[in-house]
Regions:
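Perimembrane helix-loop-helix junctions
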Residues: 151, 178-208
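Short helix- or helix-capping micro-motifs
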Residues: 21-22, 112-117, 165, 169
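Short acidic/glycine- and proline-prone juxtamembrane loop motifs at membrane-interface regions
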Residues: 127-135
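Transmembrane alpha-helices of multi-pass, membrane-embedded glycan-processing enzymes
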Residues: 62, 66-70, 83-94, 103, ...
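Transmembrane-helix signature of polytopic, membrane-embedded enzymes
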Residues: 14, 90, 95-118, 136-137
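Extracytoplasmic catalytic/substrate-binding loops of multi-pass membrane glycan-assembly enzymes
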Residues: 31-44, 53-68, 74-78
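Membrane-interface alpha helices of multi-pass inner-membrane proteins
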Residues: 50, 145, 157-173, 211
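Membrane-interface transmembrane helices that cradle and orient dolichyl/undecaprenyl
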Residues: 100-103, 142-157
Length: 213
């Protein structure tokens, strides 16, 4: 059984490749000890000590999550960078799934995963505790939901879209740019039919209610 697991076919399967990229992402993002804390992280630590419904330049979700992490694990280098690294790993998984849903073969998945794993700006965002890693995850989740919706034409995905959009707004308001882009894409294509969908407007209400506090 052990030999079967370690067979070349399994070690080079699509699922195995995704696991390798996820592990690579986690290792790169969790262990850059020589850099120490980034100065913006001190700002987020201060906000997590003074929780509120919003701040001058940051919505409340990311400081709130940091407060939970610090309560559970303290304020060590590893604990502070755990969630951004996990966000990066989830982006890897979602990217693989999106490529597959859009008809990409094995080579396309490897290329896409290489890009999202080692792109310098991604590595920076996922190696420090700011809103960037969480924001990128929300963007990726919104795109994943849209790809799934267009693939299946299941209108229930609008509910999930609204939930992710609401959490994205609680992370960084610039996710509105993506929402506006999707709005235009729907308006200018045959998929404008979704504007008549009850689920789309339910999703919009959910996003508004999440963001409203």
């Amino acid at each position: 059984m052990f030999e079967k697991v370690l067979s070349k076919q399994n070690l080079l399967s699509e699922k195995a490749i995704v696991v390798y990229f996820v592990l690579l992402k986690l290792v790169i993002c969790l262990f850059p000890f020589e850099y120490g804390f980034f100065r913006d992280e001190l700002y987020y630590i201060a906000m997590s000590d003074n929780l509120d419904f919003g701040y001058v330049d940051v919505p409340p979700l990311v400081p709130f999550l940091l407060a939970i992490v610090r309560t559970l694990f303290g304020t060590s280098f590893i604990s502070l960078h755990l969630l951004p690294a996990v966000c990066g790993a989830l982006v890897v998984v979602l990217t693989s799934s999106m490529v597959k849903k859009m008809g990409g073969n094995f080579n396309a998945q490897v290329l896409a995963l290489t890009c999202v794993t080692i792109a310098p700006i991604y590595l920076f965002w996922e190696s420090v505790y700011t809103y960037d890693a969480f924001d990128k995850l929300c963007w990726t989740l919104m795109l994943y939901v849209m790809v799934s919706l267009l693939e299946t034409e299941d209108k229930k995905y609008w509910i999930f879209f609204g939930l992710v959009a609401g959490l994205g707004l609680m992370t960084k308001i610039t996710i509105l740019y993506l929402g506006f882009g999707i709005f235009l894409a729907l308006l200018l294509t045959k998929d404008r039919k979704y504007f008549l969908s009850r689920q789309l407007w339910i999703g919009a209400v959910i996003a508004f209610l999440i963001f409203s506090p």
